[in-house]
Amino acid sequence: ILGAAPTAEEGAALVKSYQEQGILVTLVGGIIDQCIEQNVKMGASLRVIPLGYDVTSVIHVVSVAVRAALIFGNVKPGDAAGLMAYTKERVPAFVNAFSPLNEVIVAAGAGAIALGFPVLTNEDTFEVPGALIPKVAPADMNAASLDARNIKIKITKIDIPVSFASAYEGEIIRRGDMQVEFDGSRVDCCELVHMKEPGEIEDHKIEVIGPDLDEFEVGSKHSIAYVVEVAGKSMQEDFEPVFERKFHSYINCIEGVMHTGQRDMIRIRISKDTFNAGFRLKHIGEVLYANVKNEFAAVVDKCQVKVITDPELVTKIRHEIAVPMFNKRDERLATMTDEAVDVYYSCIMCQAFSPSHVCIVTPERLGLCGAVSWFDAKATNELDPTGPCQVVTKEKPIDERIGEYEDVNEAVRKFSHGALDDVSLYSIMEK
Ligand code: SF4
């Protein structure tokens, strides 16, 4: 975004709209002060990056686009035509330039257009179809920009008073910024998905049992349990832990909320800013409800959420329901052997940050993270057959003693994009 919007409110709203869609936004010129004025948090981890006040600082983001072509597109230095073809086709970037435009901004905009990035402006100037789109009101810029680049975004609109976006996933809430904390290492906490009969569930019922955030002292620690009850014709108990593993990501996507851990070892911090914006416990329920219904629509017909902070009730839920349930799941796996199954599963969930990483998950061999069991991988595959966990056959043994199979090696080669040739499941000494 180049220049200042007509008002600071409009500028900040545009920036936040992109941030909520998971789009990286870089800022040049007056828009930076507008964001500061409107308390928009900025930084690389929040995907809103101020580059500088002078229009020439736009070169930093051009550099990112060019490097994308060199690194990921294998474009050779000096191949200008190949570079421009790559950025046009593969780098879904665009420019929003606010009026008044001067010659330097126009020159920078022409450079963007040459790379295939359309420029949208609110200035009343001439149009170059698909390249320079004038007279776009600030409120329409988001939709017009996505349209110009044919970007389709699946958004889950959730009724909460703060933003919900993957940009907030790595956000750290420091003790001094924290309104309250729920800490499973000190008090009883747990998170649980429980399959029920359809008649036992009232869809979208969010219940808070116990004191809410405004009844806690600033900086205090408390117990929490949230139980997500689901029902559906194709729902299976095996899917419960798969949903639970996603809670970490869902809750972290809330602006000003930090979540770590899983099962009964969780910690959640809620920031003062988020509390002051009106965030309360029912909103945790809203986030869990919306995401479970959205992501697992194929198997979840009805969903209700209970958020419990009554300490005695949380202790009861943790020890009498959650822990026995976790133990039952673990015991089921503990009695299974690799020989007892016909197939293993691959998992590439970590390729988001480690592009050639692949795990082969077997009953006796969890994924590297320790959080994906053979049952979890199986359920993930059933829920999303083209997703991160794929069936790996084990029909062509090379050496069963060290767990080497031709078909497992083939899978490892395929999913690591050739970075790994083979794997022995039981030995790091011999192979
Ligand atoms: S099983 Fe492997 S790839 Fe999958 S989430 Fe765990 S560490 Fe990552």
Task: Please annotate each region the language model reported.
Residues 9-12, 32-38, 58, 101-107:
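Short, charged/polar "capping" segments at the starts of alpha-helices
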Residues 73-78, 84-91, 99-105, 111-112, ...:
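Cysteine-centered metal-binding/redox modules
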Residues 4, 13-16, 25-26:
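Glycine-rich beta-alpha loop segments
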Residues 45-46, 52, 67, 90-94, ...:
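Extended, intrinsically disordered, low-complexity regulatory segments of metazoan chromatin-modifying
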Residues 8-19, 110:
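Histidine-anchored nucleotide/phosphate-binding helix
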Residues 22-24, 33, 45-50, 62, ...:
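Long alpha-helical solenoid repeat scaffolds
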Residues 2-8, 28-31, 51-54, 73-75, ...:
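Structural motif
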